[in-house]
From Swiss-Prot:
It comes from Trichormus variabilis (strain ATCC 29413 / PCC 7937). NCBIfam families: PRK00823.1-2. This is Putative pterin-4-alpha-carbinolamine dehydratase. One of its GO terms (biological process) is tetrahydrobiopterin biosynthetic process. GO terms for molecular function: 4-alpha-hydroxytetrahydrobiopterin dehydratase activity. Keywords: Lyase. It catalyses: (4aS,6R)-4a-hydroxy-L-erythro-5,6,7,8-tetrahydrobiopterin = (6R)-L-erythro-6,7-dihydrobiopterin + H2O. Belongs to the pterin-4-alpha-carbinolamine dehydratase family. It is an enzyme of class 4 (lyase). It comes from the Bacteria. Gene3D superfamilies: Transcriptional coactivator/pterin dehydratase. Its EC number is 4.2.1.96.
Length: 93
């Protein structure tokens, strides 16, 4: 099981991620697109990096908005995997 990060490390890691917020024991970002088709195209781009990392975000789609939430469920909070996947997602347009 992945090691939970302490509060200081979580704050430090989160400060390096533009567009992400801490929501309790979760890391979230919301992206807005021109339309539903672009939103779904973005979601499809998340598949390969999530599979490669073996760490899958929770994804909510609302027409042209996509909310991506990361947490390590089996660890009960945030781990390095969450921040690594968030950094990868941040690079996806």
């Amino acid at each position: 099981m992945a090691q939970l990060l302490g509060d200081a490390e979580i704050q430090s890691q989160a400060s390096k991620l533009s567009g992400w917020t801490l929501e309790g024991s979760k890391l979230q970002t919301t992206r807005k697109f021109k339309d539903f088709i672009e939103a779904i195209a973005f979601v499809n781009k998340l598949v390969e990096p999530a599979e490669s990392a073996g760490h899958h975000p929770d994804i909510e789609i609302s027409y042209n908005k996509v909310k991506v939430t990361l947490t390590t469920h089996d660890a009960g909070g945030l781990t390095q995997k969450d921040f690594d996947v968030a950094a990868t997602i941040s690079q996806i347009n």
